[in-house]
Design a protein with these regions (language model features):
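Catalytic-core loop-and-flanking beta/alpha module that positions acidic residues
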Residues: 1-191
Length: 191
């Protein structure tokens, strides 16, 4: 059983890429953990008005749970779920401990499982090759805004502002609020 589960895990890893997103760019620990301790950037996308089918089917909220029950979940992979629902095995990468729920995370999953499912089921006008390749690249939407970290390097800041000016992307700089504990953004460049 361990060998089967290990092989399945390898298959999922080799055929899947994940982009992690959050609903809130002002979470201090997120800047510390994922943006090089406030030296990096946060990129904002507007998914509300997206008409692109691929993003509607590939973006999932994280489920925050008290306790992982992967053994029961993995055993269920051997029934018909996997044949009829390509998202089912991806549930394994859509759960995290409830300790992380402050992240308000979503994951964009780019997986061969989806491609195989849609070709096999012939889902109308879905042409995966337009969005996806075997190298896990997808055409992504234009960022709405870039948020520069509190401690971003000045040269990096200038380069990003130049790029955003050319691409007509809003730029904001993160600052501490009056309390000194919370973050807020101040506009540098808006379109």
């Amino acid at each position: 059983m361990k060998k089967i589960l290990s092989d399945l895990e390898d298959k999922i890893k080799n055929k899947t890429s994940i982009i992690c997103l959050t609903e809130d760019y002002c979470i201090n620990p997120m800047w510390a953990h994922y943006a090089d301790n406030h030296n990096g950037v946060c990129i904002e996308y507007d998914f509300k008005n997206i008409s692109n089918f691929i993003f509607k089917i590939l973006c999932f909220p994280i489920e925050y749970v008290e306790k992982s029950n992967n053994t029961l979940e993995l055993s269920a992979l051997f029934d018909d779920n996997i044949k009829t629902n390509p998202v089912w095995p991806l549930r394994l990468v859509l759960r995290k401990s409830h300790d992380w729920q402050y992240e308000k995370e979503w994951r964009l999953i780019v997986s061969q499982f989806f491609k195989d499912f849609f070709y096999e089921k012939n889902h109308g006008d879905v042409y995966f090759d337009e969005y996806y390749s075997d190298k896990h690249y997808i055409k992504f939407i234009k960022p709405k805004s870039i948020y520069l970290g509190l401690d971003i390097d000045l040269k990096d800041e200038e380069k990003l502002i130049d790029i955003c000016k050319f691409r007509k992307i809003n730029v904001y700089k993160m600052k501490k609020d009056k309390s000194g504990y919370n973050l807020k953004s101040e506009p540098i460049l808006e379109f």
